Amino acid sequence: KAFTTVYCSINHFELNCNHLSISLLTLMNKKYLIIGAGFSGTVLAHQLVKNTDCTIDIWDERDHIGGNCHTERDAETGIMVHKYGPHIFNTDKKEIWDFVNSFGEFRPYVHRVKAMCNGKVYSLPVNLHTINQLFGKSFTPAEAKAFLETLADTSITNPQNFEEQALRFIGKELYNAFFYGYTKKQWGCEPTELPASILKRIPVRFNYDDNYHNNIFTGIPVDGYTGIIKKLVEQDCIQVTLNKKFEPGMDTSAYNHVFFTGPIDAWFNFKYGRLGYRTVTFETFYADGDFQGTTQMNYCDEDVPYTRITEHKHFTNWEQHNKTIYFKEYSKETGASDIPYYPKRLEQDKALLLRYRQDAEALKQVSFLGRLATYRY
């Protein structure tokens, strides 16, 4: 099999091509089309070329490679900007870490998120410092754990939705402060309308660890993610065509196989309806010096229209910049012309996905991979 060690881990996204059970014998002297020049498509292209005798065309509808991980230098400040929101590379697998580092230098980075709530700044994920701040206490870990147990709503024995799941384990005080307003803004509905599975494990730490990620390997590429992806496809037998949008029904008969990394419902021209997504928009601001002192500040209050502010200079703390650039991020329902970000995965979406998957399994010359094609967060 060609893809036993192909992984990419960006935030919560892990591409694992190990499920593609295509023998090397069937991949010799072939021509392939990959739709999408993000991490999924470009890692796949690199591994196909490395392990087989083939030529590859990659199409992407945008004017750049990198997908939502695209990074670029801001012309005004010189700061490396995460164009579609923050992405931190994190993994526990050494083979993944070694793989990406073979295409560019990564430097250590600890992602520390702060939260603005009722005019005060707190530490996230919810940890011992957060609990002591919110309640004006100086609990030890054991005391904090015992205290939260008194706040938990034990009358909820079988949580049926997001809100019940939160109230069952952390109580209304922490829920109202850090989860209710933010969740409502991010998902565009009441938390009671969201499945409990979204909040499978309440992110509460009974220590002062405020590192957002627990992974062994975490870092930021010195030359940005787009620099890494550019090197992945710098091979004569890989041809990347930008500003080329895939349209359902396009003739792909010139290719032995097509690998699709776009939304699975788009491949089928939304014939059963659109899968539910939330998208985000960004408002760009410039300032002198340092705006907020951290990479990411979440705004938990419902009356603040944006969900978070990302200040990009803090991703690369080894660089020095006199000015700063930051994004205010707004969440909204995904329209036909919007970029899909977060799958809603409500019950109606799961039913719809099952129908698309059944159709996808019937396609012998097409494979679906990546977060959009598999409808995963």
Per-region residue spans from a language model:
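Glycine-rich FAD pyrophosphate-binding loop
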Residues: 49-73
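Mid-domain catalytic core of redox enzymes
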Residues: 51, 244-359
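Active-site/ligand-binding neighborhood in enzyme catalytic cores
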Residues: 118-123, 128-257, 261, 268
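Ala/Thr-enriched low-complexity intrinsically disordered regions
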Residues: 2-5, 26
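N-terminal Rossmann-like FAD-binding beta1-loop-alpha1 element of flavoenzymes
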Residues: 32-57
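Short FAD-binding loop at a beta-strand-to-alpha-helix junction that anchors the flavin cofactor
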Residues: 361-376
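Dinucleotide-binding Rossmann-like beta1-alpha1 core, especially the glycine-rich loop
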Residues: 77-153
